[in-house]
Amino acid sequence: MSARGGSLHGRVAFVTGAARAQGRSHAVRLAREGADIVALDICAPVSGSVTYPPATSEDLGETVRAVEAEGRKVLAREVDIRDDAELRRLVADGVEQFGRLDIVVANAGVLGWGRLWELTDEQWETVIGVNLTGTWRTLRATVPAMIDAGNGGSIVVVSSSAGLKATPGNGHYAASKHALVALTNTLAIELGEFGIRVNSIHPYSVDTPMIEPEAMIQTFAKHPGYVHSFPPMPLQPKGFMTPDEISDVVVWLAGDGSGALSGNQIPVDKGALKY
């Protein structure tokens, strides 16, 4: 259970894609530091082009239980970040319940595989629609509440290592994650006058349902040269990172200890991007 004197005590965090994996980890870790949580996830299939299983209502319920186990309050709802009206309604309800909004973790995203010229319209539009447009809609819905609260705050945009380098075999994903860098850096300038910081993080090889090892193996078997764009991590040559390791960085960026940082791209990759 979180201590009353946690580093984020009295603050409120809005976390997308919160039903499982990174999103749940971020929500729970922020709660452990004293923040109350607004948690959302679609809890349904995003598109027929996304081949791994979606999060479920039961997953979101488990996030709620985990946050409450930390002694914090949580407002959870099944919302598609592509749905502007539902996002705005949730933000309004969160502010009404908790009185403020201080932290946004724009975490929700989807991944797919395919060479750029072989992608279907549905594959392209789903990934861009969720990862880029959905993130923009999230920020458009939450930023006014942060400004109105007048407390400054921190926005963490969850991009990817694919937002900093080429990733053959999922160029639509890389395009969406690169675009988040421009979104992050522009917003960092625009929100500076309000004391709101905006940074992006770029995780690499995290153990979540999105990884789809079989899809990766099939892609590399068909196109062996692509494997060079997915090197092992120098600090951890085998296996994947855990969501909790990414949450270490999210919690730090949410708090005052990172107060000098805004408009930064932070690789969370155990050195892999240095190859």
Swiss-Prot record:
Matching Pfam families: adh_short_C2
EC numbers for this chain: 1.-.-.-
The name this protein goes by in its record: Uncharacterized NAD-dependent oxidoreductase MT0715
Record: residues binding NAD(+): 20-22, 41-42, 80-81, 107, 177, 206-208
PANTHER family on file: DEHYDROGENASES, SHORT CHAIN (PTHR24321), ESTRADIOL 17-BETA-DEHYDROGENASE 8-RELATED (PTHR24321:SF8)
Keyword Mitochondrion: no
Keyword DNA-binding: no
Enzyme category, top tier: oxidoreductase
Keywords attached to this entry: NAD, Oxidoreductase
Superkingdom of this protein's organism: Bacteria
Residues holding substrate: 160
Family: Belongs to the short-chain dehydrogenases/reductases (SDR) family.
Residue numbers annotated as active site: 173
Upper lineage: Bacteria, Bacillati, Actinomycetota, Actinomycetes, Mycobacteriales
Gene3D superfamilies in the cross-refs: NAD(P)-binding Rossmann-like Domain
Single GO MF annotation: oxidoreductase activity
